[in-house]
From Swiss-Prot:
Domain of life, source organism: Bacteria
Catalysis: reaction(s): (4aS,6R)-4a-hydroxy-L-erythro-5,6,7,8-tetrahydrobiopterin = (6R)-L-erythro-6,7-dihydrobiopterin + H2O
Native source species: Mesorhizobium japonicum (strain LMG 29417 / CECT 9101 / MAFF 303099)
Family per similarity comment: Belongs to the pterin-4-alpha-carbinolamine dehydratase family.
Lineage of the organism: Bacteria, Pseudomonadati, Pseudomonadota, Alphaproteobacteria, Hyphomicrobiales
EC number: 4.2.1.96
Xref: PANTHER family: PTERIN-4-ALPHA-CARBINOLAMINE DEHYDRATASE
Protein name: Putative pterin-4-alpha-carbinolamine dehydratase
Length: 98
């Protein structure tokens, strides 16, 4: 998967398919908050995503407070959003919904 920065049009199209994800205020990242029933579910989600992110060699910027996980994705060496970010966002959506 490429680490080439996506165009604004490509990011907009991807966000339309990603549901609750949005462009961060910096314009170079995408973000989403995931809210779970409790801390255990939030932590299980983070563990599952961490294992997938490690395999992808692409790691989220995230934080967890009780049952909420806030995520920001970008590819630092590309200076913006890449296909890797979109792929990880899709994986996170899948883990959250399934």
């Amino acid at each position: 998967m490429t680490r080439e920065k996506l165009s604004k049009d490509a990011i907009t199209a991807a966000l339309a398919e990603l549901g609750d994800w949005s462009l961060a205020t910096d314009g170079a990242s995408i973000k989403r908050s995931f809210v779970f029933r409790n801390f255990s579910e939030a932590f299980a989600f983070m563990t599952r995503v961490a294992l997938a992110a490690e395999k992808m060699d692409h790691h989220p910027d995230w934080s967890n407070v009780y049952k909420t996980v806030d995520v920001t994705l970008n590819t630092h060496d590309a200076g913006g959003v890449t296909a890797l970010d979109i792929a990880l966002a899709k994986k996170m959506n899948h883990y959250f919904g399934g």
